[in-house]
Amino acid sequence: SGEWELGVHIADVANFVETGSEIDLEAERRGNSAYLPRLVLPMIPETLSNGVCSLQEGVPRFTKSAFINLDKRGRVMSTRLARTLIHSRKRLTYLEAQALIEGDQKLARQHTRAEPAYEDELLDALRRADKLARIIRARRLRDGMLVLGLPEFELVFDEDGRVIDAQPEDDAFTHTIIEMFMVEANEAVARTFSDLSLPLLRRVHPEPTFHDIEELREHARVVGFNLPEEPNRTDIKSLLDATRSSPASRAIHFAVLRTLTKATYSPAIIGHFALAGDHYAHFTSPIRRYPDLMVHRAIDAFLDHTENGRKVPGGKGRARLRSTLGGDSRIADEGRLLEIGRHCSDTEVAAEGAERDLRSFLVIQFLAEKHLGDELPGVVTHIRPNGGLFVSLDRYLVDGMASL
């Protein structure tokens, strides 16, 4: 029939972290895990995140699942949430999975971290996942999803923790497979609560303001692209697509990134501009994001009153369900959601800033020791009206101002 069923299974952290417990209070305070170069500051103890909350190969694990039915063009027809118990058949790295999709088992074995045994059922599942992700991505691009073509590099360290080089991160499509499936699950959860008119901590991304757009319009004019005074998402997507393969790609895509507002956490239903979605929440990383853990608790309330998601009533029954869930403490009220949303938005900014600053420090330390006085290739990403150029180095992705 060409129809698909996608199942996305996420570790049931809420099953092990009780509301109001010491672990929960500390997780709330931290807001999220912080990923610094060579150091992770976890939101919850590693005995949980690397133990019973880790979906390990060959081990049964409690999960929450989103089941999404899609038509042959990737349009969502129905969704269902449930508590589940899964038994992971195989752990794969991204490059290993990509090689298997491409039919190269020899290359796959070079990237494995587990026993390199690949059953036909696994290979077929990978190929189907690849096909479905491409269908979903094509649908999202038609809907206006923005895709920034910005390079990413990972630092290479010696045994003493000092940077000795940088190398491009792999661009395997398997990263996109996971991304597309996670986005579908996040939307399915957000839609479920929107359909019931229930409050939820959402991930929101407002439209950029037109004041911020003016600088982007100037960048676009330099490369011969005329953005209207009040561009919409389609206009910005056209600019990104038109410059994706040009020498100006990085500068333009950086300019778009600077123009876009920062996504935050809020109970407001204002959608996600970059994803071209009306309803979005974070559900897929409760190990490392407190908003996801709050969403999981809200899902627990929903599942308790719908026979594990199997019986979601309509009509008057839906109104009764809404009233019942509205009195369940696991579904926080808007005041509490606003408070947590602001806090977790702030902790996210702090964690990202710490990662960025430490990375820049380590790279600059390396450049000062090994490349002082050398000429290095870079891209001009911004010109100050009163003089000076901002340059981003190609290989190390650090920015600096060159005075004129």
What are the language-model segments listed below?
Residues 1-404:
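Electropositive polyanion-binding surfaces
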